[in-house]
Amino acid sequence: TWQTSDPFPERGTGEATLAERTDGTIYYNTRCHWDQNPQPTRRRAAVSEDDGATWKDFKVVDVLPDGLQHRAYGCMGGLVRLPIQGRDIFCFSNIDTAGEQRERVTVWVSFDGGETWPVKRLVESGPSAYSSLNAGRPKTPSEGQIYLHYEAGSGSKLARFNLAWLLGGERTGDGKVPAWATQL
């Protein structure tokens, strides 16, 4: 059987992404599509400590854009936890543009389960929109790979890269890249 959770702590959100941390808590990251919310062009996050029944520690994630920045409507983004033992490395994808077109699909990296996002890397500067992420499985040929599927103009594309490539991106000023991350 299954049960629904309590609602997310803010109205006007949707198309959420979830990732379980190594301690069993669940990180919730969501789109905002209501211009009555504060900072409607930024992503929202919360955490569950009870298997997703309730959500706490709600916050606006200042460093993560939510779609086009000239209007409040958001854009579905992707989220994945990399399967690295004992580490809460998350990747998040969305568009990162000040323009009026959906473009510049970008991936951000967190090394502390979504608390900070210290690095981002542009994947493609052209048209892009909704995106999803997945990670290769340990002990398979896909181990260490990160997969980004995204809308690109009238079709879709798949990009494949690894954490080392992402670390070559731009520092956001939101937290630090830990020394151990460069040795993975």
Task: Specify the residue positions occupied by each region the protein language model found.
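Asp-box/BNR beta-propeller blade signature and adjacent active/binding-site loops
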Residues: 1-184
